[in-house]
A protein has these predicted regions:
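Hydrophobic transmembrane alpha-helices and their helix-loop junctions in integral membrane proteins
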Residues: 1-163, 167-189, 193
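Cytoplasmic/organellar membrane-interface segments at the starts of transmembrane helices
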Residues: 5, 126-127, 134-139, 192-256
Length: 256
């Protein structure tokens, strides 16, 4: 149902409300039920996370509606966060918090950029649009920042978010989970490049098409620029957010 909501509401829901369940799981296994993350629960949650990542990214790769693609990527990226929770310990919890904060910004930005694409072309269907790179190159750049961050390309925030998760997974000998996470990143790149190629690179199906510049989209542009700047700022200087996440993780499970 996410793909049917108005763009501002959709961006808010995708960025924030999808994290409520994740926060509940994290709190339940730390403050509310200390010691609840037993080895068998960690194992089960890790495989659930791997399956979630795969199912989400395969759904994204299949669809042509930008909203559906991005909605399925919510599922996939929640899988990464669940994997960090499954890894447990201070490092896993710090990775959980860092990934969550990064994803709030990136996912909200992607849905807002998709709305700008819809404003310019009149459709979310990738098969019915095109030519935006030539018509609006700034919009193309604005899409690439959150898209490549979602994939985990440096020097963007998503690179550090995934690095924290994968480092801890390898440190615990979870090779299978690491392989799944890397494979999902490749499929994420495929689906983001599908949007790029179809919406921006290929010519528009209608040779007479011109982008709609009459709509008042300035607030949307400002919001996307701010979110993109945050993504880039975290990517170029991640240590402050890593330190914050580690400090916050140390408090989990230690509250009275």
């Amino acid at each position: 149902a996410y793909h049917t909501l108005p763009a501002p509401v959709l961006a808010l829901f995708a960025g924030l409300l999808t994290k409520v369940g994740v926060y509940a799981v994290l709190k339940a296994t730390t403050d509310m039920l200390p010691g609840a993350m037993t080895p068998w629960l960690s194992e089960a949650l890790g495989w659930v996370a791997a399956a979630t990542m795969l199912m989400g990214v395969l759904g994204a790769a299949y669809h042509w509606d930008m909203r559906r693609i991005l909605a399925f990527h919510i599922v996939s990226q929640i899988g990464y966060i669940l994997l960090a929770i499954a890894l447990g310990g201070d490092a896993g919890q710090a990775a959980t918090l860092f990934y969550t904060l990064h994803h709030i910004v990136v996912k909200a930005n992607l849905f807002l950029v998709a709305a700008l694409i819809w404003r310019a072309t009149g459709s979310y269907d990738l098969r019915r649009i095109g030519g935006l790179y030539a018509a609006q190159p700034a919009l193309a750049l604005l899409f690439l920042v959150p898209a490549l961050s979602l994939v985990g390309i440096p020097p963007l925030s998503g690179f550090w978010a995934k690095l924290l998760v994968l480092q801890e997974a390898l440190a615990q000998g979870r090779v299978a989970w690491t392989v799944v996470a890397l494979a999902v990143s490749v499929l994420t790149l495929y689906s983001m490049m599908k949007i790029w190629m179809q919406a921006f690179w290929k010519p528009h199906p209608d040779p007479q098409w011109r982008p709609d510049t009459s709509a008042r989209v300035a607030p949307g542009w400002v919001a996307c620029l701010v979110l993109a700047a945050i993504t880039l700022a975290i990517g170029l200087n991640p240590q402050w957010l890593i330190d914050y996440s580690q400090a916050a993780a140390l408090q989990l499970g230690r509250l009275p």
